[in-house]
Amino acid sequence: MTFEFFPIALKRSLRAAALALAIGAGFALSVGLSGPGGKAVAANDGFSDGQKDQIESIIKAYLLKNPELMLEVQRVLDQKQEAARQEASGKALAANAASLFKNTSMPYGGDQKGDVTVVEFFDYNCIHCRDAVEPIGKLIDADKKVHVTFVDFPIFGKDSEGAARVAIAAGKQGKYWELHRDLLLHKGSNCEDAADKLADKLGLDIAKLKMDANSPETTKLLKDNSALAGKLGINGTPHFIVDNKVIPGAPEDLYDQLASMIGDVRKNGCKVC
């Protein structure tokens, strides 16, 4: 991290910060700053422009001598911003809990009536979504009571949307998870044609598949998914949700994190799901 922003950002707020610190501490200008005639000026009497400049210079010099304080300030700011983000996320999850955890129109993997639901927003051409497919498959195989809701969220253009439509249609023939998995394990770009070929290998009825892929119902689902992502502030993939907790991206320990969250819900109950 560099401090190139210091002259601009700090100069704007340094005077106010210095005054706030001085007044908050309740000290007079006995540190060498004095009013006319050598009389100390009380903090609540205010400061002259010259005195303000002196205070600013003292604080600026101290910060330049101890730049690590700026890192500490940034750390505290990051913590506050993260706390605010989590609070906003929690409220958004609670407000949209029914759409996330009780929506039977969305395709799924695992137990249809599972006791805990994992929600994944993803795109078939998302590199990190490919990284997540094996941990999700492992979770479905290992935990026979988990329900994984797949929210098709094609943010990478028409090819992604075409693949998503075919996958959703495959769900009408009971093969959503199989095609979903095959698409994300498939080498190369995913599109409608690639999805059709993989669906054919799975023995699906291609004529019915194409009809369902382009149905008003599928179009509505994709629009609803996009709207839901917007309400939750999700603009990237993959994004996982378990109750009121989220995992953005696909960390190396994704399986362990999800298993821990699921265990927590089973032990302590749902907060929003």
Show where each model-derived region lies.
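Structural alpha/beta surface segment adjacent to cysteine/selenocysteine redox centers
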Residues: 119, 124, 130-201, 205, ...
